[in-house]
Amino acid sequence: MTDHALLLVNLGSPASTQVADVRSYLNQFLMDPYVIDLPWPVRRLLVSLILIKRPEQSAHAYASIWWDEGSPLVVLSKRLQQAMKKEWSHGPVELAMRYGEPSIETVLTRLSEQGFKKVTLAPLYPQFADSTVTTVIEEAKRVVRAKSLKMQFSVLQPFYDQPEYLSALVESVRPHLEQPYDHLLLSFHGLPERHLHKLDPTGKHCLKDDCCMTAPAEVLATCYRAQCIQSAATFAKRMGIPDGKWSVSFQSRLGRAKWIEPYTEARLDELAAQGVKRLLVMCPAFVADCIETLEEIGDRGAEQFKEAGGEELVLVPCLNDDPNWAKELNRLCERAPLML
């Protein structure tokens, strides 16, 4: 049967490096209540203030990593889409972005017009967060309601602990770890601490004690920090990396609110001060390279590390369109449960 579509969803990107396009993208992204979880008037005021200077700064950053084909995130996601077409045997493989184009609404509407009633929705985020997984699911729900679409959805669950994801990660990173290095830093995207507090169903664990490696299942299911740390520890164990030669940090802090720690910026300085000369950095919260990996870590992070006394920061590429990753992702999508 070929009546079951697969919809891969990633974060998105500005249409170009022009300031106006970056401003439009940032406005859509930051006004999402799952990203900045403040009341609408406060969120609107805060985003308006951010948009005074941030678009020009971000446009410069995007321009520094933009490819001839376009945004690296979009280009790499399209390449993964093509690789997945060789694996997914049940119907078409489509790609949408939560922010920017092609939008979830555009793609779901087209699939409905083509007669597809079964869709596997695949948010390409290994760990769970409201600002990634939940917002994709809720946007799909909104489109279905607004357009009165007759569709059934299976939804790919967070896969930070799944053998398929870990196997793909190990095989992708292995060649880099075969070269001499002093330390491996696993830098995950950060989140405001309040995002974790509000999702702790017990109200007793997240960020109140050091439970990330021992969190009960009900807490672990929605605790982003615990999922990051557990996946990092499992990866390090599978690679045989001794304790002390790897660590975890969190990047991309925005605003003055307290975010989960340790911060990547601080960790880079600490490692250089500890005598680390050749530092490997991988970013396992991302399955495709993007501005947060290429510019924030590969460019600015490398410069900061050298200024602090390090010699070389090597950015390990994300999974991107690796054929082995496509095979493993297909296995994950095959068993996605029916949810909507």
UniProtKB/Swiss-Prot annotation:
Any one GO BP annotation for this protein: heme biosynthetic process
Reactions that this protein is recorded to catalyse: heme b + 2 H(+) = protoporphyrin IX + Fe(2+)
Binding site residues for Fe cation: H189, E292
Pathway it works in: Porphyrin-containing compound metabolism; protoheme biosynthesis; protoheme from protoporphyrin-IX: step 1/1
UniProt-listed HAMAP family: Ferrochelatase (MF_00323)
Swiss-Prot/TrEMBL keywords: Cytoplasm, Heme biosynthesis, Iron, Lyase, Metal-binding, Porphyrin biosynthesis
Enzyme class, UniProt record, top EC level: lyase
UniProt-listed Enzyme Commission number(s): 4.98.1.1
Location of this chain's protein in the cell: Cytoplasm
Gene: hemH
Reported function: Catalyzes the ferrous insertion into protoporphyrin IX.
UniProt lineage: Bacteria, Pseudomonadati, Pseudomonadota, Gammaproteobacteria, Pseudomonadales
Organism: Pseudomonas savastanoi pv. phaseolicola (strain 1448A / Race 6) (Pseudomonas syringae pv. phaseolicola (strain 1448A / Race 6))
GO cellular component terms listed in the entry, alphabetical order: cytoplasm
Family: Belongs to the ferrochelatase family.
A GO molecular function held by the record: metal ion binding
Protein name per its UniProtKB record: Ferrochelatase
InterPro entries, A to Z: Ferrochelatase (IPR001015), Ferrochelatase_C (IPR033644), Ferrochelatase_N (IPR033659)
